[in-house]
Every structure is written in C-alpha cells, then in structure tokens.
C-alpha cells in the first residue's frame, strides 16, 4: 500500500457569477451566501477518505476571466470542474471558450478530464433556460470531437439547497484520483529506462587502461 499522502489539484472554471465559489463553499461545509467577485484565484483544502485512504484536495477557483498567471492555475491539474448557469445563455455558449482555455494551458499530449456542472437548479426553468436536451447534445458534440477521453459527467446543482453537490464531488474526486495515479504510473515508466551499454573506450577508462587506435 502506498503510504504517501495524495494531493489532488481540482480547478473550477466558467463565467463570472455562475456560482463557482458557492459550490466549493458548500462542499467545504460552509453556509450558502451570495458571494461577490473573488480575487483572481484562490484555493481551499479538504481532506477526505476514499477507498480506505486519506486524500488531500486542493480546490482552486478563479473569478472567471483571463489573467497573467493562468499557467499557474492550470499546472498539474488532476480534474477540472466546468460550470455554467442553466438560466444564462451566455454562460452556456462560453463553455467552449473555457474548454479551449483548458487545452491551451495544459500539455499538448495531456487531456485533463473535466466534469460539467450546471448551477442554480433551485430556480425553476423557463423558456429562456438551457434545456437538458441542449446540454446532452453539447456533451455529445464535445465527445465526438475527441476533446475528452471519456464520457462527460454532468450534474445540475444548487448551492442554496445543497442539491447534487456531494454527488458531483464524489465523481470529481474519483476522476481526479484516477488521473493522479495514471500520471504517477507514466512518470515511473519514463524514469525507468534500460541503461545503455558502455562503449569500449568507457570500459577501458573505468579499468584504468587507455588504448589509442
């Protein structure tokens, strides 16, 4: 059993005021509040037990706009939470921008897994709200384009009523832990390379003998 404490980095992206900080605060066990704009980015720590091992979560949040140090925010991410307001058309249309932002700030050969979250489900849907059918179509389109490695997990949440917050983060953490383990495995495979055989000249020097040809 690996006794090393695992630290998972989970970032949250999406437009301003869609409720990103509220769902993080809810998951942290803090009461719902109508939060204003946060600083460019902040992070929170939480320890949980999953599969009989303690895991440390580092939950990062950004206020929803580009900034100079975005590379820091996206570095070494294990899972990304992409949020939109199910009653806000623009936040839904901007999802593709955030997906491209994620791709642009991570390694070329690395596809960071993400979970899609629709916020403010406590408010009744109207004709201007984003229908579940449109959301399913969007997910299928992203999957068909090969932007993600696996099927997209989608949750509709309410920080106000604590709806689906725990369920969403259970999935997020499992995905992040799997990504973490895969990265560790790949890192070990890269570092363990067969030693190249020494040339004749190197062997002779090691033996204290030098021949000139």
Swiss-Prot record:
The protein's matches in SUPFAM superfamilies, at most eight in alphabetical order, are given as: P-loop containing nucleoside triphosphate hydrolases
Please give the name of this protein: Ras-related protein RabK1
> Its GO CC terms?
late endosome; lysosome; phagocytic vesicle
Name the keywords, alphabetized.
GTP-binding, Nucleotide-binding
Which species is this record about? Answer: Dictyostelium discoideum (Social amoeba)
Give GO MF terms, alphabetically.
GTP binding; GTPase activity
Sites binding GTP sit at 14-21, 61-65, 119-122
Biological processes, Gene Ontology terms: phagosome-lysosome fusion
Q: Does the keyword GTP-binding apply?
A: yes
Q: List the disulfide bonds.
A: none
**Gene for this chain:** rabK1
Keyword field contains Nucleotide-binding: yes
Task: Tell me where the sequence motif Effector region sits in this chain.
Answer: 36-43
What is the similarity comment for this entry?
Belongs to the small GTPase superfamily. Rab family.
* Pfam families referenced in this protein's UniProt entry, alphabetically: Ras
């Amino acid at each position: 059993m690996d006794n090393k404490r695992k630290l998972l980095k989970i970032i949250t992206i999406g437009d301003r005021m869609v409720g990103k900080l509220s769902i993080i605060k809810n998951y942290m066990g803090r009461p719902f509040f109508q939060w204003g704009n946060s600083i460019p980015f902040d992070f929170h720590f939480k320890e949980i037990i999953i599969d009989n091992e303690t895991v440390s979560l580092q939950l990062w949040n950004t206020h929803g706009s580009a900034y100079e140090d975005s590379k820091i925010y996206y570095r070494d991410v294990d899972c990304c939470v992409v949020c939109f307001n199910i009653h806000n058309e623009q936040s839904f249309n901007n999802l593709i921008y955030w997906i491209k932002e994620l791709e642009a700030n991570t390694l070329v050969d690395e596809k960071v897994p993400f979970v899609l979250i629709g916020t403010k489900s406590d408010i009744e849907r109207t004709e201007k709200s984003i229908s579940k059918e449109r959301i399913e179509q969007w997910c299928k389109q992203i999957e068909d384009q090969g932007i993600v490695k696996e099927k997209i997990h989608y949750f509709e949440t309410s920080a106000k009523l604590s709806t689906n917050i725990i369920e969403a983060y259970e999935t997020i953490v499992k995905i992040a832990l799997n990504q973490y383990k895969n990265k560790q495995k790949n890192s070990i495979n890269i570092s363990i390379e067969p030693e190249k055989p020494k040339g004749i000249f190197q062997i002779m020097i090691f033996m204290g003998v030098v021949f000139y040809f």
